[in-house]
Structures are given as structure tokens and as C-alpha cells.
């Protein structure tokens, strides 16, 4: 996620393996069943979302003129997640994110609603708005808590992000906590690449080059999405050659 001089953009690689569906003797994997869904309201584009079969909530989406959203896995216990859902009535993120995106037009209100939600599982939410430096990474704990060891709400341009990254116009969130030891090479490699870049380089073409580069593109990358809420730019590229 990065801020342009006049807008903010968000991009993601969805990495997800170990699934296939056989239809008429043909094995289909995640990339072959990834589609771009356009929701309309009063005949006008409202929300765009990267979707999979049977999906009714949102994991990668943008509200036109408003804000974008993506969810990243934060490693956790599935058994505990189920217990929180059953006993505490904590929310699953897909339905909650759809409700908020449908009813909340502005970025700041959406960030606060997401951050204060009682979620059943730890995870990361990456959100970008239509204005410059409207970008945030929400490191979520289950049960509506914000634990001492969990990174605070990180924003583009804030001091805590700049202190760690040496800059304020971008944030990199993969599947591990900021300021902690990375679980894989993606975050440190991409931060190293960005340390040699300048904000004036940012464009949709530049974002695609970064997302498909060696630092972020993995063997199990299912699709890549780029969203710019201010302009309505959106594109999702599935990678059907993966998992073969």
C-alpha cells in the first residue's frame, strides 16, 4: 500500500494452495475459479470484489470513490476461532466487511468500525481511502481485544511506521506482525526494494511490476489485485498456470 501525491492505492497477492475441484475430468485450482464481481447500486458501479465459488462476503474489494479492503491471514488456532464464534458470537470477517463496505462510504469511519469489531480470529486488514495518505493496517486480535504485543493501528504517514520503515508513503503487510521477525522473505525483500524507490515513481504500471516481482510473487499466488479508490481503477489478474 502506498500514497501517491494525490491519492492512495492498495495492492495484494493472494497466496493460497491445496485446493482443487474436478469437473468432467478437468482439475480446477483456485486461479481457474477466480472471478471479478461488480456490484451495482441504482445502475452505477458500487463495489468490485475478487470472488470464489460460493463466496458471499468480501476478502478483497473496493467501494468506488470510497475505500478498499483486503484481509491477510494472521496465524492462529482454528479450534479457538470456532469456540469464539460459537460461545462469544464473534464475527467472521467476510460478512462483517461486506456489511461495513455496503453501509459506510468514508474511509475513516470504515477503519474505526473494522478496528472495533469483535472478530473470531486474529488477522490483518489492509485498507486504503480515496485521499492521499488514507491508508491503514489493522492487526486484529480475536474477541474484540487489542493485546499489548499486537502492533497498533498503523497509518501511512504516521511516526510509528516511519520509524520502522524509514519512510511514510508506503506500508508492507504480509502474514507476520510488523516490527517482529518475518516468517518468510517477502516483507524484508519488498521493504529493501522500496527503500530505493521514490514516491514519484508510483503508478499503476509500477505497482503491477512490484506485485509480480520476485519479492512478492510466490509459487502459490492465486491472483493479484490493484485498487485505486479515488479513480475507480481496479484490476484482478488470476494466475492459472500455478499449481500445475
Where are these regions (language model features)?
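A contiguous strand-loop segment
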Residues: 1-92, 120-122, 222
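C-terminus-biased signal that marks the final domain/tail of proteins
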Residues: 1, 95, 101-244
Amino acid at each position: 500500500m502506498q500514497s501517491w501525491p494525490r491519492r492512495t492505492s492498495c495492492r495484494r497477492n493472494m497466496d493460497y494452495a491445496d485446493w482443487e475441484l474436478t469437473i468432467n475430468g478437468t482439475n480446477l485450482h483456485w486461479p481457474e475459479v477466480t472471478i471479478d464481481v461488480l456490484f451495482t447500486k441504482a445502475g452505477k458501479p458500487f463495489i468490485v470484489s475478487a470472488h470464489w465459488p460460493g463466496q458471499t462476503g468480501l476478502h478483497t474489494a473496493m467501494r468506488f470513490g470510497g475505500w478498499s479492503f483486503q484481509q491477510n491471514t494472521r496465524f492462529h488456532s482454528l479450534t479457538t476461532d470456532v469456540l469464539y464464534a460459537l460461545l462469544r458470537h464473534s464475527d467472521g470477517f467476510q460478512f462483517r466487511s461486506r456489511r461495513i463496505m455496503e453501509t459506510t462510504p468514508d474511509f475513516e469511519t470504515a477503519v474505526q468500525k473494522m478496528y472495533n469489531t469483535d472478530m473470531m480470529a486474529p488477522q490483518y486488514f489492509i485498507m486504503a481511502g480515496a485521499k492521499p495518505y488514507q491508508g491503514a493496517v489493522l492487526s486484529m486480535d480475536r474477541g474484540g481485544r487489542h493485546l499489548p504485543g499486537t502492533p497498533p493501528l498503523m497509518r501511512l504517514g504516521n511516526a510509528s511506521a516511519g520509524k520502522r520503515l524509514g519512510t511514510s508513503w508506503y506500508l508492507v503487510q504480509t502474514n507476520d506482525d510488523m516490527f517482529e521477525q518475518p516468517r518468510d522473505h517477502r516483507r524484508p525483500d519488498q521493504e529493501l526494494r522500496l527503500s530505493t524507490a521514490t514516491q514519484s515513481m508510483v503508478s499503476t504500471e509500477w505497482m503491477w511490476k512490484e506485485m509480480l516481482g520476485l519479492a512478492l510473487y510466490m509459487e502459490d499466488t492465486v491472483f493479484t489485485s490493484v485498487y485505486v479508490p479515488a479513480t475507480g481503477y481496479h484490476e484482478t489478474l488470476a494466475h492459472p498456470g500455478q499449481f500445475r
